[in-house]
Amino acid sequence: MNRISIRIFSILFILASNAALAQSNGDAVSSKKSTPASASALTIDACFSPKNYPKNAKLYGWITKTDYAEVVDGVLYAVNASTLAKTQIIKVDSFVKITKTAIKSLTGEDVNLFGIPQIKWTGDYQGWFEVGRFVMAVDFKKPVTDNLMFGPVQVKYSINGQSEEAQATEYSPDAELIAVIKKDNLYITGRKTSASKNLANSGSGEIQITKDGGNGIVYGQSVHRNEFGISKGLFWSGDNDKLAFYRMDERRVTDYPLFGIQSRPAKANSIKYPMAGDSSHTVTLGIYHLMSDRLVYLNTQGTYDHYLTNITWTPDCKFVYISWVNREQNKMELRKYDAVSGGLVSVDYQMSHPKFVEPENGPLFIPGSNTDFLLQSESDGWNHLYLFKFANKRPIIKQITKGNWEVTDVLGFTKDGKYLLFENTMASPLERHVHALDWKESKVTATGMSAKIIDLTPSNGTNKCSFNAENGLMINTLSNYQTPRKIYLIDVTNQIGNSLTQNGPTKTKLPYTETAIPAGATITIGEGVNHKIIFESPNPIASLGLGKMEINKRMVNGFDQYSRIFYPSNFDPNKKYPVVVYVYGGPHAQMITNSWLGGGNLWMHYMAENGYIVYTQDNRGSSHRGLAFENAVHRQLGTAEMADQLDGLAWLKSQKWCDSTRVGIHGWSFGGFMTTSLMTRTPGKYKVGVAGGPVIDWSYYEIMYTERYMDRPDENPEGYKANNLLGYADKLQGRLLMIHGADDDVVVWQHSLLFVDKAVKAKNAQLDYFVYPGHKHNVVGPDRVHLYKKISQYFFDFL
């Protein structure tokens, strides 16, 4: 929900076969109320202790074409990619001291710095980094010395004002300029005075571009409530001369009060919160030309409440692409605009769907071309790649990947442009692999695709990669059900070359069966000489003696669906256990993956060690299973999801180890909505529920998300009514604990308060309620331990 899920770090992700699990000695689980009685050392505090998280390497990118930077035992090293030999650069303590001293001597200011920040390398051993409002230049070719005139770290320039005033920042590609948003207005700061006459004449090294920000006008920040893949609002051109930026006018949007309780009396702090069916904000895109000091806004036309996303500059910096989406979210146009005039040049692609469209990625340009690009699209029902090759200013569109699997990320092209690297679910929806595709030769057929596809990743599981096209090397972070974290350095160039001449070793056999490899594709896989392990985390919870985990796949309502079970370490299949169902169930989330975290968490092990089975199922509506799986919930959020969860409940109750009279359910956000729905719309099915931050009435939720899945309230009154939980408050059976953060600006507090009011009027509703003052949509920080103690105790007391 708004990309926020209730995933918690640190889990033991162990897949098991469907065979019966081994028995072990231990106390029998009571057929009555369960109480926390376990031999395991796992406590709730331990569930959130960093010592129980997989360890990670401290990598700082490529310091040269052949060496990457890494901190080990308090020292920054340059590590040779071929030999893994380390060359000491500087001690972390020395780096911190030199940096703080440089700032203090120049400005008199003290800054907080406790380690080496991420450094943007611009040359061999040279780069820059941020500390507060300061941009620091680093040159490790210089000797490590306290003499600031010759030291390796110096102040490059600073943002005027205090660092906390900057609402957003974005550096130009050459790192000589920075776009800054302060008090909702746009500024440009830097010492590259040759880029702008105004900047050269400013005296302060800063120029103000906009002046009407504030009071409902917002510049340069994320818009549309972060939907459509939007994560920022500032976009530099590749030539460092032009800056595109969002302008958002929220004056039509209703003010919504959040109350700060720390003042006396409490103070109302208003936010702009556009609820479904109400007036939305207006977004436009401006372009500022530094050299000519010219500001132009794109002529996007249409109604005021459209959506603009996927902002992409062409390589020659003459044009800007935008994915335009209508408010109904059933039509998308890929529009090309002239950066000088702001006029529309062409509409190069259109897509419509009777349910919804959701473009989240802009064009990826082919190396050496200012016109031809790749675009991700779900037009065939799965997220795949399409080549747009232009002739006479019109595109010829060719699909280059196909199959019942999804492209989940694109890493870019090899240096010679021959191969495209992309992340995908080809092996399994539970996994992520990175493949190299000979994209020019790829041919799509009725049954799939025929192409050279080389699996670059070293093992089954979740592989997250970053690729450096300049040196042909890729850093691959792997986790799976056996591996907390393992980091590989992969020679992509050699891996591709070797794979074309011989087959690699076969990867580990999966404990589940997947058959999504595209017909006709040549797949080469395997860990080999081109994979070097540069870091491996020990198992942080090996000594805790935790129980096993099992993943199943069943056909549910026409689709394969995955479920996961945590068992107690002393599990006895001949005894009866209470079950806690953990649910999310909403779009843009996948609870079950082949990874160490995998959507589970240590709290689930904690509950298992205290005598409960913990079950999770990814129902229709969740992600990475194709468009039909996700949009099955359209206009009826909650209905199909409940049907799938009830099928899972029936399966649970058919297991001889399940105490069918003692099944509880818990979830947060969309999971809180699901928990409340199942406790009230199917009363008596679950004995106990804990619902956190729940949507209660979809007409009170934000426009962008709600109208995509439900349309407007006046267009779909039946759907809104059927899934409005206020109409079911009097049907509640069993015990339900509802929890909310008082400052929640995603699912506003009003949702659960309205439900409390209905429950009180129902008189017989068994509703318990708890509020976390000062917390937003998730309870974070030290209070999270308190939250999970409360959730656990509720199940101990009533399930």
Residue locations for each model-derived region?
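Bacterial N-terminal signal peptides that target proteins for export
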Residues: 1-9
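Short alpha-helical "patches" and their helix-cap loops
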Residues: 5, 336-339, 491
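Beta-propeller folds
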Residues: 10-12, 21-467, 472-473, 483, ...
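Serine-hydrolase catalytic core recognition
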Residues: 47, 255, 317, 446, ...
